[in-house]
Amino acid sequence: MYTYSLLNLSHCRRQTRKKRKTDHTEGFLMEETKPKTVEDVETVDVYTAKGFLSTGHRYLDVRTNEEFAKSHVEEALNIPYMFKTDEGRVINPDFLSQVASVCKKDEHLIVACNAGGRGSRACVDLLNEGYDHVANMGGGYSAWVDAGFAGDKPPEDLKIACKFRPKEN
């Protein structure tokens, strides 16, 4: 039996680094937020992520459609952060607009890829876009499977909440 440490993501994220700047035309002191980096991304383990999902957080799977089709967390949103091309992997140019079409900026999101790398980079983009409650699931879907959380359902029986594909040329 596991105990879940359910923390509010807004409190466990690192403090935003801000610098002060004076608007000399109006004389107001303004705060300017630096762009977020991978160091600003909160990472949670799979047990914490599972606990968050049970309290209403959404699971954003940023793996490719092919990876997602093999197996995924039930009711996950699949919006690939990268696509495989003949030249290698390229960032999905529509990632942020696709996320915006199904997620509000104040929603709590658990972001995951296969091992954690793409997920953390996707979190950086989401944080810089104004999503305040995002966390990367450390170890990605592989860690989810290793923890024994993956179901034995065949892919066609799994519910798919959202799925995006690359644009056809």
Curated annotation (Swiss-Prot):
It is found in: Mitochondrion. GO terms for cellular component: cytoplasm; mitochondrion; nucleus. It catalyses: [glutaredoxin]-dithiol + arsenate + glutathione + H(+) = glutathionyl-S-S-[glutaredoxin] + arsenite + H2O. It comes from the Eukaryota. Induction: Up-regulated by arsenate and down-regulated by arsenite. GO terms for molecular function: arsenate reductase (glutaredoxin) activity; arsenate reductase activity. GO terms for biological process: detoxification of arsenic-containing substance; response to arsenic-containing substance. Residues 60-153 form the Rhodanese domain. Residues 1-59 form a transit peptide. Disruption phenotype: Reduced arsenate resistance and increased accumulation of arsenic in shoots and roots. SUPFAM superfamilies: Rhodanese/Cell cycle control phosphatase. Inhibited by trobenzenesulphonic acid (TNBS). The active site is at residue 113. Its EC number is 1.20.4.1. Keywords: Mitochondrion, Oxidoreductase, Repeat, Transit peptide. InterPro entries: Rhodanese-like_dom, Rhodanese-like_dom_sf, STR17/STR18/HARC1-like. Expressed in root hairs, epidermal cells at the surface of the root and in the pericycle within the stele. Signal peptide: none annotated. Arsenate reductase critical for arsenic tolerance. Reduces arsenate to arsenite in the root, facilitating efflux of arsenic back into the soil to limit both its accumulation in the root and transport to the shoot. Essential for arsenite efflux from the root, but not necessary for arsenate uptake. This is Protein HIGH ARSENIC CONTENT 1, mitochondrial. It comes from Arabidopsis thaliana (Mouse-ear cress). The gene is HAC1.
